Regions:
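Alpha-helical transmembrane segments that form the membrane-embedded catalytic/substrate-binding core
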Residues: 106-127
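Bulky hydrophobic segments
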Residues: 1-105, 124-138
Length: 138
């Protein structure tokens, strides 16, 4: 199974990076003048619209499924959670650097971190349901 999961994980990671890392430049600079809807930093937990939160959860479900298949030593709840948080934090940090250097109009959001972690552990839960076995040790 790992033989098929590894290319899927690589493609998945490349897709997530393509969606989250490139600067989001507005085609019209006046879009962000005056009353701006863009917030560069969102540090208030759970102050987010439900669709955005849900999409971030869904985006990380494959991570929680594929990572433990490709890297068996990551096959515990706590390790998948830690890897999900680390991956999400890496994305948010890259977005912050892009904002500071390129004016990339990306929002660095603590809610994305929470949603991505939830998605990762949900994916791991789905994997455990699909492949029952003895619980992994942390």
């Amino acid at each position: 199974m790992r033989r098929f999961a590894t290319p899927l994980l690589i493609g998945y990671v490349l897709g997530v990076l393509a969606l989250t890392i490139p600067p989001d430049f507005s085609p019209d600079p006046t879009d962000y003048l005056g009353e701006s809807a863009w917030t560069p930093l969102q540090l208030v937990p759970f102050a987010v619209d439900a669709p955005s939160f849900l999409l971030n959860v869904v985006m990380f479900v494959p991570f929680g499924v594929l990572l433990p298949v490709c890297v068996p030593r990551v096959g515990s709840f706590w390790r998948v959670l830690a890897c999900s948080v680390a991956a999400s934090l890496s994305i948010e940090t890259a977005q912050l650097i892009i904002n500071l250097t390129l004016d990339g109009l990306r929002t660095v959001d603590v809610n994305d971190l929470v949603a991505n972690a939830v998605g990762g552990v949900l994916g791991f839960g789905l994997l455990r349901l699909a492949r029952p076995g003895p619980p992994s040790r942390p």
